């Protein structure tokens, strides 16, 4: 099988010849920039300063030569813009924890006077910063820049501003990226923009110059109970924008794309869902179903959702809402036992992730512990297809290279490639 055939088989719940593998194939399966640099050195690849895909996570593009070494079966059409409204077309050097990396040329980074850094929406430093990396930190945290929400002046269009209206420039960018990677035979995944129905990463409006509306994460998660009509109008209009964006991408790319990343909104914590299954079913699921139903009726694409945490109680409604795949499969969270997940929902949804614990085992375990957990997870999740191997979310800063290599070698061992 080609990589593309392998991934399609997994999404059709057929047993592929090997377990498909993803590193850098979607926005939440990335690799920290410094770790990526060290991985390239380990495999003897040409030195290139890591090119930052998104400054909030400080993850870097996985280029084709490294993807070959890692055995990747998925190719991401990397985002046109990042969390802070930086455009990923032109680049400049910046020092990140002593290492040279490439960041978008319109990014403006300023010292905070305490060893950390600020970034600004669309690189406009005449405005308050929208992101902050603390001293000795590795990531930029989004900053809330708006006053407390005034319900007397509530206008749902203020939060609808977050949703991505696809532009001709964005489509042209992705066509250029696709032309460079189309010969790889990897499955192609794309996320055309933000359609997240309240993704905490986007609620503060880090890419917007003058965000309005409900911008405090705490206020947002109370809003469904306090201002249900406001939230429903935001979701209704956001869903219409999403479907129009999907239509534009189908017209531009058709079946050259295999997987559509719809949404990165988290609904789980380490200890379980942070809302009741009934709230998810009644408020969120109808809009997700509308998006997924359009995709399945009008395209050949499979759909993918990211959702961290212990989400076992709401997985039935994600399935009913039409998602084909779920990432990152956080098996370290409460209620997310791998075997129970596979036995209960393995025929209904593709598990994309869950391959190794990135909170404890991968960063702090011994290589043999990493190998053992990877082989155990592969044995459980790979049965009858329906699985794409990946770590649980991005590979974090300071993860030992020997542990990452142990993980990759274990996957190759399981697949008969080593």
Residue ranges and their predicted role:
Residues 94-173:
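A gly/proline- and charged-residue-enriched helix-loop-helix capping module
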Residues 77-92, 192-197:
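Short, glycine/charge-rich beta-strand/loop segments that flank catalytic centers
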Residues 28-30, 86, 124-131, 197-198:
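Short, surface-exposed beta-strand/loop "edge" segments at domain boundaries and coil↔beta transitions
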Residues 1-40, 45-53, 140-418:
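Active-site loop segments of alpha/beta catalytic cores
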Residues 2, 71, 94-98, 266:
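Residue-level detector of functionally special positions within alpha-helical transmembrane segments
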Residues 72, 79-82, 122-124:
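Beta-hairpin (beta-strand-turn-beta-strand) motif
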Residues 59-76:
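Catalytic domains of carbohydrate-active enzymes, especially glycoside hydrolases
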Residues 75-78, 186:
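Short secondary-structure capping/junction motifs at helix and strand boundaries
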């Amino acid at each position: 099988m080609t990589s593309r055939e392998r991934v399609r088989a997994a999404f059709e719940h057929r047993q592929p010849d090997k377990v498909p593998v993803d590193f850098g194939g979607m926005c939440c399966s990335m690799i920290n920039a410094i770790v990526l640099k060290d991985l390239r050195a380990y495999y003897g690849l040409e030195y290139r300063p890591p090119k930052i895909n998104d400054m909030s996570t400080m993850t870097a593009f996985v280029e084709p030569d490294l993807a070959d070494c890692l055995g990747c079966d998925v190719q991401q059409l990397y985002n046109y813009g990042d969390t802070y409204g930086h455009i990923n077309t032109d680049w400049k050097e910046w020092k990140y924890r002593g290492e040279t990396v490439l960041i978008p040329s319109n990014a403006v980074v300023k010292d905070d006077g305490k060893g950390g850094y600020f970034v600004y929406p669309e690189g406009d430093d005449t405005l308050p910063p929208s992101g902050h990396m603390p001293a000795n930190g590795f990531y930029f945290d989004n900053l809330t820049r708006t006053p407390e929400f005034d319900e007397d002046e509530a206008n749902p269009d203020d939060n609808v501003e977050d949703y991505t209206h696809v532009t001709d420039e964005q489509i042209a960018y992705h066509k250029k990226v696709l032309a460079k990677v189309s010969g790889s035979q990897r499955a192609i995944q794309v996320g055309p923009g933000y359609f997240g129905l309240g993704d905490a990463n986007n609620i503060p409006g880090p890419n917007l110059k003058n965000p309005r509306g409900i911008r405090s994460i705490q206020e947002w998660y109370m809003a469904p109970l306090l201002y249900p009509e406001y939230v429903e109008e935001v979701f209704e209009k956001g869903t219409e924008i999403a479907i129009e964006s999907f239509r534009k991408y189908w017209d531009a790319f058709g079946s050259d794309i295999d997987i559509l990343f719809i949404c990165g909104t988290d609904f789980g914590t380490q200890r379980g869902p942070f809302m009741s299954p009934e709230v998810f079913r009644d408020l969120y699921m109808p809009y997700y179903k509308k998006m997924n139903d359009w995709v399945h009726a009008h395209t050949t694409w499979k759909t993918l959702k990211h959702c961290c945490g212990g989400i076992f109680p709401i997985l039935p409604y994600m399935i009913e809402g039409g998602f084909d795949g779920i990432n990152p499969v956080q098996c370290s969270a409460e209620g997310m036992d791998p075997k129970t997940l596979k036995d209960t929902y393995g025929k209904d949804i593709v598990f994309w992730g869950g391959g190794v614990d990135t909170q404890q085992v991968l960063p702090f375990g011994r290589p043999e512990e990493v190998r053992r957990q990877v082989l155990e997870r592969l044995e459980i999740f790979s049965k009858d297809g329906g699985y794409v191997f990946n770590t649980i979310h991005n590979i974090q800063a300071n993860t030992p290279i020997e542990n990452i290599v142990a993980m990759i070698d274990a996957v190759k061992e399981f697949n008969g490639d080593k």
